[in-house]
């Protein structure tokens, strides 16, 4: 665990709030390369904090981290340009993990098709198969526009929340 992620864990233990960096100018379309890079880096740090919470069996931390990640995506116009966070999640979590479900849904509904093609070699094989099956099921029922709307409507806490019992 790198020092900054450990520092964020200690901060959460004492304050019960997730430390994160607000990225300036995320609402500008398209975001600058610098803004995009900062956004990618901050989301990766939050993903690492979620994984640390998973390893330490800290579901409240994991759930608060997910709330912050979702807020960052809702506030900004950035899309994750890097794909390293996806492989990181797949390498560090188990099949069926709540964060894997979140990542799968994000890639299906929010990632541009050209970006997926460009980086398909970076995506875990089981993610690609799962995405294919989910997307086919959804697209058969709805068109593209309604599918995007559905993603936004379906972002409910129960999809990614870790049970706290």
Annotated model-derived regions:
Residues 1-29, 136-140, 144-165:
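BTB/POZ (also called T1 in voltage-gated K+ channels) oligomerization domain detector
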């Amino acid at each position: 665990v790198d020092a900054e992620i450990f520092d964020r864990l200690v901060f959460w233990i004492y304050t019960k709030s997730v430390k994160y960096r607000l990225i300036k100018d995320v609402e500008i379309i398209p975001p600058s390369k610098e803004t995009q890079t900062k956004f990618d880096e901050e989301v990766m740090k939050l993903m690492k904090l979620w994984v640390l919470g998973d390893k330490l069996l800290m579901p409240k931390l994991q759930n608060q981290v997910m709330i912050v990640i979702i807020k960052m995506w809702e506030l900004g116009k950035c899309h994750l340009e890097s794909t390293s966070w996806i492989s990181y999640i797949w390498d560090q979590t188990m099949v069926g993990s709540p964060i894997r479900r979140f990542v799968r849904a994000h890639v299906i509904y929010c990632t541009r098709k050209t970006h997926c093609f460009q980086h398909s070699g970076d995506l875990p094989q089981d993610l690609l198969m799962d995405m294919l099956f989910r997307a086919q099921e959804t697209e058969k029922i709805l068109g593209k526009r309604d599918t995007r709307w559905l993603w936004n409507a379906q972002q409910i806490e129960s999809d990614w929340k870790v049970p706290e019992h």
